[in-house]
Regions:
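Catalytic-core elements of nucleic-acid end-processing and repair enzymes
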Residues: 1-156
């Protein structure tokens, strides 16, 4: 009943209160709500990075910072690196954190290192299987967080 109310069903309607096939009606409404939430989350996720993406990128001779373009990018990153960044989609969509990727310049599509930013600060830098970054990667991310991130966040 709460799901029906949330979707603005007529709560005086016998069809809403007493559907012929209650379980099927429940499952159908659940799928619809999940689809709507998924679409809203994907849209909110894309909006987070629309203004940020161009301003947040940084490239050196060996490394680059890139922003994800869609929610599937976080899932792919987590699967490839065997860590949990794929579970951060809703946090990013709710603007509780940002996720950016560190890539090797010669392999820009291959997941390498993932960075979490919260409240304008680096919270995590993780490689494959939650490994710590190399000194080179840490130095690059530190440079990015000092020189690029503050301006990117202001513009976003």
């Amino acid at each position: 009943l709460q799901m029906c109310q949330g979707q603005n069903y007529d709560m005086k309607s016998s069809q809403a209160l007493f559907p012929k096939h209650c379980n099927e009606a429940h499952d159908e409404l659940s799928r619809y709500i999940k689809k709507c939430r998924d679409e809203q989350t994907k849209r909110a996720f894309r909006e987070v990075y629309e203004n940020l993406a161009e301003k947040a990128n940084l490239t050196s001779k060996k490394l680059q910072i890139v922003c994800p373009k869609q929610t599937d990018d976080l899932i792919t990153e987590g699967q490839a690196l065997h860590h949990c960044v794929g579970t951060y989609i809703e946090r990013v969509a709710a603007k509780k954190c940002l996720i950016v990727f560190v890539r090797r310049v010669e392999e820009p599509e291959k997941p390498f290192v993932t960075v979490e930013v919260s409240n304008g600060k680096i919270v995590q830098i993780r490689g494959e299987r939650n490994s710590d970054p190399t000194k080179e990667v840490k130095k690059f991310v530190d440079l990015w967080s000092r020189k690029v991130l503050p301006m990117a966040l202001q513009a976003a």
